[in-house]
């Protein structure tokens, strides 16, 4: 990924990967519409006899970490099949730059399942002394930065130490460090990364006519700094793009009596998974496949990905088509953790081995 420029066509193909995780099978229609040279390469590879999932797995390389990044911090159980293809979806906070959303979309072509794993952003990362020493050299006052041990700040630390000198598999110290932390702590290898801003969610939801969902409680919150205003009533309703963004971002506000209410990161992750499930169940159908084509150009500026060429895109297309054809099973996994106070900062502590 890094800083290299991508052509508009490649960006469109990258977007296919995001939508393949949500709307499996769309690529089959896409290849019949776009007709420039890179897409012909995409088509040629898509219909080659190679297995897309096997090709993606063959691109895997060892993490080659300089040392253990954590103090033997390991989640207590396995989250995915070792042969699953795992795409990390990143959604940033538009004001702070921290990662507001970290979601793993795990595609298991052998067991025909798509698993969504939302990683709570407040998870405490128990960094190793080796890493802390390197961090102190690069950033002497890092310890004074509040919440720096949260997983949603991992990319900041990766950038500070110039992790792997920008020569890791994603060619980006922020993404490489975050991916290696996830692999070390959760034993989930990240095959590719998709960086998507909240504004993209608005456009996708509006284009498909909204998402019907049962909102569990009043969501009312206002933050002028983030240009964020959430006002969603409790109950079954269809959310447009703006409210859909508010639904997945909501974490605190006021209740029906005007009193302060906080649902915490774990509850917010449950809402996000519920939203994704609702979107898939309502819009994963043949009649909606054609809609994807017309929104590519409008969304590509909001999305970046480690999948940057037609051949890689078509490998995901094969996986998506296979899962869709076999009527895949959709699952979700909640990360088990508990609230803790560490030096006056709120964190979530993982259940460990």
Predicted regions and their residues:
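N-terminal Lys/Arg-rich, disordered targeting/topogenic segments
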Residues: 1-12
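Non-catalytic, solvent-exposed segments at the cell envelope interface
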Residues: 2, 27-353
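Hydrophobic membrane-insertion alpha-helices, especially the h-region
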Residues: 14-28
